[in-house]
Amino acid sequence: MFTQANLFLILLLAIALIAKNQSLIIAVSVLLLIKLIGLDQKLFPAIQSKGINWGVTVITIAVLVPIATGEIGFKQLGEAMKSYYAWIALGAGILVALIAKNGITLLAEDPHITTALVFGTILAVALFKGVAVGPLIGAGIAYLVMQAVQHFTS
């Protein structure tokens, strides 16, 4: 029961409890429960390979609820597009998607980066009440910074 992985998860749970971070508490508790009941070999590969997509899908559903309820329609969209804030948000959405594209390349070429990204995400979630938005954005930002460093040092 006290493997290095379990000890690490228990440590993360303690950090989450101290930081009062509900998302991390739930995530670590679910992982420990899956391990405890012995389904880790079956479930972890699926969670690891598809979990980010599931999470993005759930977030997308939550964001689209106002459209589904009729709270936001074409009229509101048209009115919003008259605001420069909406154009900034549109540009930010495009930029983030393009940055994430480079993250896929970096994670494929250097899987060790994943460990640092995961640890950075855990620290931000646990200690600074950050939100785990996925490693692709982090890897994309890391890729851009690495390219800039390489450009200026070579």
Swiss-Prot record:
Topology in the lipid bilayer: Multi-pass membrane protein
One Pfam family, short name: DUF441
Transmembrane segments: 8-28, 54-74, 87-107, 117-137
Principal localisation: membrane
Regions annotated as coiled coil: none
Keyword annotations from UniProtKB, A to Z: Cell membrane, Membrane, Transmembrane, Transmembrane helix
Localization annotation: Cell membrane
An annotated GO cellular component: plasma membrane
PANTHER family per record: UPF0756 MEMBRANE PROTEIN YEAL
Protein family membership: Belongs to the UPF0756 family.
Protein name (database record): UPF0756 membrane protein BLi03063/BL00400
Organism of origin: Bacillus licheniformis (strain ATCC 14580 / DSM 13 / JCM 2505 / CCUG 7422 / NBRC 12200 / NCIMB 9375 / NCTC 10341 / NRRL NRS-1264 / Gibson 46)
Lineage of origin: Bacteria, Bacillati, Bacillota, Bacilli, Bacillales
